[in-house]
Amino acid sequence: MFQLTDIPRLLPEILLLVLALLVLGSDILERWGRTPEAQLERVKSSASLTAIGLGMVLVVALLQSGYLYQLPETAPVNFFTNIIRNLQSGGPGGDPIIGVFATDHLTMIARLLIIGAALVTSLLCLDIRPNAHPGEFYALIIFATLGMCLMVGANELLLAYLAIELTSIPLYLLAGYFRNDPRSAEAGLKYFLFGAISSAILLYGMSLAFGAALNAVGGATNFNDLTRFDRIGAFTGSSGGLLTLAMLFIVAGMGYKLAVVPFHGWSPDVYEGSPTPITAFISTASKAAGFILLFRLLTETFPAMAGAPTLNEEAGGWTAVLAVLALLTVVIGNLAALPQTNVKRLLAYSSIAHAGFVLLGLLAWAAAQPFDREQGLIALLYYLIIYSLTNLGAFGALALIGQQTGGDDLDHLRGLSRRNLPLALLFTVCILSLAGIPPLGGFFAKFYIFMAGWQSGATWLVVIAVVMTIVSLYYYLRLLKAMFIEPARDEAPVSMPRGIGAALTIAVIGVLVLGIFPNLILSVLERV
């Protein structure tokens, strides 16, 4: 039953909903202006309101979590301490709200990551000129953020599905937002069609899980109930077969959402055709939310079916399925990136390959020791944080290059260091982090992920992943060669607007600091 004391626990989600409606409302009130100057002011107003609002929601979520500051019990009572005390009353812990939404440490950390990614995306969009209704563009970003926050805390099958749809529908619209651009229109249509198929597959898997529970114990959609029934061996005979089939359909449906091979066909075209800041948002926040929901679905709904990703007679379960998907994803993602000449398409295949690395963190659930399982989850979260910062920076730099040079092919990077050295250096840090070069965050993220895979028994997969990491150096170094060695195709300087400059700086500082001082974030992740 919902109680008033649950409201503080949902405060970030409530604020996101209010912010989305506020952005829409403010845009409607300003629609009386039809001149180009009035249209420009509407864009600036919607963009600024979104960025400031997301920044405030991020501060609220950070204070609520207690990770930055925990109010002492002996603190004096005044106006400010009362605000912080009320905020932190909704901090990590407690039973799931009405049994369907968990506010544990995993939700808190993922919520901060998603809102932070949305904030950086809104900064990247400051110089985008949407169509006649800019408020809709920014409101869609906020609604998608709200859906992702609900995804990571979902503790029930129906809420998980609704949260996925609340995330997906705004992203379909954002991908195809520039209708006059054929590539954007194609991206939106393709994203919608593949997304609809994946949603159908996922919903069918969830219905099979409910059917298995209905056949065995009278029905259940709550993760905790399904976990309890699974562990006591309630799913036997036909119920066990239904549950296995449900697991396969759920993995396939989530595989589409996460662009895991062989469900990745939509990803390169959608990444290439979408507005570049939206591509950054899809490849980071959306993927992070998807992987965390997949972790909850598999470890909380099918814990007894984990199996092992080894090459001996113990192999089986969903970890073996994920191991095969990780192998295909890492190999095909990296090999397909080698011949690419369009940088957005190259980074799309790079993102596919990185999804394979993240799957290695999930395999640690097969480890015999609980400590190793915990380390696997920490490695997965650390990887998602570093990957999100790095990809936001890389796509943000590419968005600026595309605006200034008129394209995002490899040729448009040529001589960038002579046209804007700070931009080239910021882009270089992101590329080197994606490649896993020390001492950047990408190196330690891959190291922890490889350790998690090794502890799970998938040593064969770790070896292949290391080899593919070396292969990836080729296409990443091609980008650096174009920026620093090849002659410029145009000598005109490339300017860096303040919004994109701020977003890139935030991302690069995060990659550097969390790489050189990983304990700053690992000490927080250990609470999960």
From Swiss-Prot:
This is NADH-quinone oxidoreductase subunit N. It holds the Pfam family Proton_antipo_M. It comes from Chloroflexus aurantiacus (strain ATCC 29364 / DSM 637 / Y-400-fl). GO terms for cellular component: plasma membrane. NDH-1 is composed of 14 different subunits. Subunits NuoA, H, J, K, L, M, N constitute the membrane sector of the complex. PANTHER family: NADH DEHYDROGENASE. Its EC number is 7.1.1.-. The lineage of its organism: Bacteria, Bacillati, Chloroflexota, Chloroflexia, Chloroflexales. It is found in: Cell membrane. Its main location: membrane. The keyword Translocase applies. InterPro entries: NADH-Q_OxRdtase_suN/2 (IPR010096), ND/Mrp_TM (IPR001750). The chain crosses the membrane at residues 10-30, 49-69, 106-126, 139-159, 192-212, 232-252, 275-295, 318-338, 346-366, 377-397, 424-444, 457-477, 502-522.
